[in-house]
Amino acid sequence: MDADKIVFKVNNQVVSLKPEIIVDQHEYKYPAIKDLKKPCITLGKAPDLNKAYKSVLSGMSAAKLDPDDVCSYLAAAMQFFEGTCPEDWTSYGIVIARKGDKITPGSLVEIKRTDVEGNWALTGGMELTRDPTVPEHASLVGLLLSLYRLSKISGQNTGNYKTNIADRIEQIFETAPFVKIVEHHTLMTTHKMCANWSTIPNFRFLAGTYDMFFSRIEHLYSAIRVGTVVTAYEDCSGLVSFTGFIKQINLTAREAILYFFHKNFEEEIRRMFEPGQETAVPHSYFIHFRSLGLSGKSPYSSNAVGHVFNLIHFVGCYMGQVRSLNATVIAACAPHEMSVLGGYLGEEFFGKGTFERRFFRDEKELQEYEAAELTKTDVALADDGTVNSDDEDYFSGETRSPEAVYTRIMMNGGRLKRSHIRRYVSVSSNHQARPNSFAEFLNKTYSSDS
């Protein structure tokens, strides 16, 4: 008997076939750099910086920016942001810089230049007669890179969220050490004229490069990161959610995964912890792998590890966290089952703590405490093992262990308890639910059961 086949009749004729569904054909690509070469892009001919500044500023004022010119200018302007490397800086075996080296954002990557001239038109009809100062260059670089952050804000954010962010960014770049170079609301107007800056590969690369530099190097103009910070761990929401989750429930990654009672986690956990990556290395290229073009399809995104992502945010919803209630459910990754497991884990880690004395008046008191704790443990081990099932605690002692939680789920037939449903409905009904969010899912799924 073939375990993959089904047998049935059509017009009295026996049919045997293997049902096959469409599978995702895209290969997840890990960002590990194998050739020991720095990430690289190719741009047009390096411009005269004074001419380029005037052209790009006039284009910004007229909301007519040429993306190629913007990228060429941003790469050339890196020379203004020299800093000192605080420690030896290596990533994936590549020596980025040595301690004490003078470096700029351009030291982190390789930027090749062709002989193709840029346009450098003065579309705004404004001609700056003098040469721009370094603070003026820094302000223009900061405003241009902020177009990346604005283009990453989704339309789901309600009200004037994007406009408010743009206004706050403009205020930063008109305050010392920066100087005011554009009229108010210019940034938002420019963004509306071309809202897809984050999809332009070279612009994305440069935003990630600037961010990687300013995240490590102390610099007068470090506030430029306000526009680029979204390139850090971009398309990593699955891994970032998991990291936040284990901190929130105060477990190690290994301890937390023992609670993941579902076969669909296996592939995702293997994918998320692929050996040879620098997920835990500070200031690694890994942090900016998406913007630096090191991975086409991220293995760490919410879609790549959808069951893990769903579970974590159902636990977050149970704990009343707004971020989880607003997050978008990965509909193809068993949200109903994940909501059940999330209810049990939420119950275990919500409103309960694991506490013990850690500080003492003197060494004698510490030793007395440790001796008393040892006696307690010996007594517990000598217990006859009688189970006290009051209040649905099926194990006396370590009720929070993975074994105890798993047993409770099985004893309830893999279904949520009434108390879980009431909690889910309580947190989601008091929240203004966004479309396809966890709050909306819980409201629609469980409100009639409460």
From Swiss-Prot:
Pfam families: Rhabdo_ncap. It is found in: Virion; Host cytoplasm. Its main location: virion. Phosphorylated by host CK2. Unphosphorylated protein N seems to have a better affinity for leader viral promoter encapsidation. Phosphorylation of protein N in ribonucleocapsid may stabilize the interaction with protein P, thereby playing an important role in viral transcription/replication. The keyword Metal-binding does not apply. One of its GO terms (molecular function) is RNA binding. Transmembrane segments: none annotated. The modification Phosphoserine is found at S389. GO terms for cellular component: helical viral capsid; host cell cytoplasm; ribonucleoprotein complex; viral nucleocapsid. The keyword 4Fe-4S does not apply. InterPro entries: Rhabdo_ncapsid, Rhabdovirus_ncapsid_C, Rhabdovirus_ncapsid_N, Rhabdovirus_nucleoprotein-like. Keywords: Capsid protein, Helical capsid protein, Host cytoplasm, Phosphoprotein, Ribonucleoprotein, RNA-binding, Superantigen, Viral nucleoprotein, Virion. Belongs to the lyssavirus nucleocapsid protein family. Encapsidates the genome in a ratio of one protein N per nine ribonucleotides, protecting it from nucleases. If expressed without protein P it binds non-specifically RNA and therefore can bind it's own mRNA. Interaction with protein P abolishes any non-specific RNA binding, and prevents phosphorylation. The soluble N-P complex encapsidates specifically the genomic RNA, with protein N protecting the genome like a pearl necklace. The encapsidated genomic RNA is termed the nucleocapsid (NC) and serves as template for viral transcription and replication. Displays a superantigen activity in human and mouse, activating mostly V-beta-8 subtypes of T-cell receptor. Homomultimerizes to form the nucleocapsid. Binds to viral genomic RNA. In nucleocapsid, binds protein P and thereby positions the polymerase on the template. Protein P acts as a chaperone on free protein N to prevent it from aggregation before encapsidating genomic RNA. This is Nucleoprotein.
